[in-house]
């Protein structure tokens, strides 16, 4: 009975792994994206003083999954805004300060440390950024994305104090 179980287990394992091995052999490097930290294509985020961004994968302006990195300079925070898509944020470097609501108030922000995660639900009003150190985030969303400022007259970014 034990021998039969072993044979069945090995057979099942082979059946599961064989297609994966064949798939790997057929797709060697096809579609993979590798970017080293020093090669990240940072650009100034349009309209956001003190913020840089880099599109890592996909295109936030088109339908489909996208991955973007955002870098806040020390002392820079966004003003209240929202996005049309859910966004999933992972803090890569620094402590990211996050607040919710229509009124910018850095004293009411909550820290998310490097390695931490936060979901921004579509349409949820929020503001975020850096206080005393540079912050780098990785954002994942489903395009088309965008940003709508709650108080456009206040600009997109400003001091975190």
Model regions: which residues?
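Short beta-strand His + acidic residue motifs that chelate non-heme Fe in jelly-roll/DSBH
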Residues: 78-80, 98-99, 120, 125-131
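Bacterial N-terminal signal peptides
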Residues: 9-20
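Bacterial N-terminal signal peptides that target proteins for export
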Residues: 1-11
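Short acidic-glycine-tyrosine-enriched beta hairpin
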Residues: 96, 102-123
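Double-stranded beta-helix
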Residues: 31-33, 107, 127-161
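A short, N-terminal "cap"/entry segment at the start of jelly-roll beta-barrel domains
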Residues: 24-66, 153-161
């Amino acid at each position: 009975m034990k021998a039969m179980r072993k044979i069945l287990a090995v057979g099942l394992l082979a059946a599961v792994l064989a297609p994966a091995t064949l798939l790997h052999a057929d797709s060697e490097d096809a579609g993979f994206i590798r970017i080293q930290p020093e090669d990240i294509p940072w650009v100034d985020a349009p309209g956001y003083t003190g913020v840089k961004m880099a599109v890592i994968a996909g295109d936030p302006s088109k339908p489909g999954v996208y991955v973007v990195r955002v870098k806040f300079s020390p002392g820079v925070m966004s003003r209240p805004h929202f996005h049309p898509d859910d966004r999933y944020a992972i803090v890569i470097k620094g402590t990211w300060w996050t607040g919710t609501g229509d009124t910018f108030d850095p004293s009411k922000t909550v820290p998310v440390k490097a390695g931490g995660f936060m979901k921004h639900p579509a349409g949820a009003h929020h503001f975020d950024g850096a206080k005393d150190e540079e912050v780098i985030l990785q954002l994942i969303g489903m395009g088309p994305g965008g940003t709508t400022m709650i108080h456009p007259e206040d600009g997109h970014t400003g001091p975190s104090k």
